[in-house]
Structure formats: structure tokens, C-alpha cells
């Protein structure tokens, strides 16, 4: 499902405009397809975007709040929108994942991740199940395993955030 389109950014801060009617969440995993493979992206921030100047937005808000005036915006979906800040996680080529060292193409479409995008995740010889992969608030049917032999002989930090 198409979620948006990349419009600008830099390495570590890729900016995409959200498609009207779609929802993007912090922590969501998205995919930008390219001629070289698939670039897996993770959303780390969301901000508002508008073609209307800040001064005019404040005036429209004041008119609605203070004088109960109704405003109809021409092409509201084109003028006001959400922007997603993303970072590149990996480049996937076939069943292999590589450190991403390039940006997705300008105006590349981004879509939600599917299970077949994650073929590079394999089950180790001595699997220790740690849970299913999350994308935003959704839990995907993709089990995540660590190598049990290495887990029990090393100290491991599993970091995560909650409450968002």
C-alpha cells in the first residue's frame, strides 16, 4: 500500500510527504523500491507541513477560535499534510541485506513493509525466539530469533522504547 513520497532530506534524515488518507506512525517500517533493490526505512519523527504561511495559519485559527468563522480551504489535501522523518536501515538485494550507503531516489514512492521484503531474516541453528517484528503499533507475522549459542555466552542489551 502506497504511504507517501520522498521529497527531500539527507543521509539519516529522509523526508517523505504522507499520502492523503493514509496513516504513518513513529517506528513504522517502510520500503522504497529502487533499481538496486529495496531500501528499508524507519520513521522516527512526524511533523506538519503546509503550503499556507505560518502567519495565515495563525489568522485562520484565530478566526475559527475567536469568531467561530468557518473556512473552506481549496484543495485542503494538497495544502496541508504530514511529513515523515525517516532513517535508512538496510538495502535489501534478493535474500541479502547490506548496510545502506545511498539515498532513495528523489520522489521515490514509499510503501508499507510486507513479509516478503524480509527474506533476509533467517532462523539460526540454535534459535532463541525473542518475539515478532513490530512496525509502528502493528505486530507483523515475522518471528525474530537470536542464535542461542551466542546469546548465552555474551552480554546482550536489547533496547526499545515504549509509551509512544
Regions found by a protein language model. Name each.
Residues 1-159:
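Basic- and hydrophobic-enriched, low-structure N-terminal and domain-boundary segments
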Residues 162-164:
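ATP-binding Walker
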Amino acid at each position: 500500500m502506497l504511504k507517501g513520497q520522498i521529497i527531500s532530506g539527507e543521509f539519516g534524515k529522509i523526508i517523505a510527504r504522507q499520502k492523503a488518507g493514509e496513516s504513518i506512525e513513529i517506528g513504522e517500517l517502510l520500503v522504497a523500491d529502487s533499481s538496486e533493490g529495496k531500501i528499508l526505512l524507519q520513521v522516527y519523527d512526524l511533523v506538519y507541513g503546509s503550503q499556507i504561511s505560518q502567519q495565515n495559519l495563525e489568522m485562520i485559527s484565530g478566526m475559527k477560535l475567536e469568531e467561530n468563522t468557518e473556512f473552506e480551504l481549496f484543495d485542503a489535501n494538497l495544502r496541508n499534510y504530514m511529513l515523515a522523518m525517516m532513517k535508512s536501515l538496510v538495502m535489501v538485494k534478493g535474500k541479502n541485506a547490506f548496510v545502506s550507503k545511498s539515498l532513495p531516489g528523489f520522489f521515490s514512492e514509499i510503501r508499507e513493509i510486507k513479509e516478503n521484503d524480509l527474506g533476509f531474516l533467517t532462523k539460526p541453528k540454535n534459535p532463541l525466539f525473542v518475539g515478532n517484528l513490530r512496525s509502528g503499533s502493528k505486530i507483523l507475522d515475522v518471528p525474530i530469533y537470536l542464535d542461542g549459542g551466542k546469546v548465552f555466552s555474551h552480554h546482550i542489551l536489547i533496547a526499545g522504547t515504549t509509551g509512544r
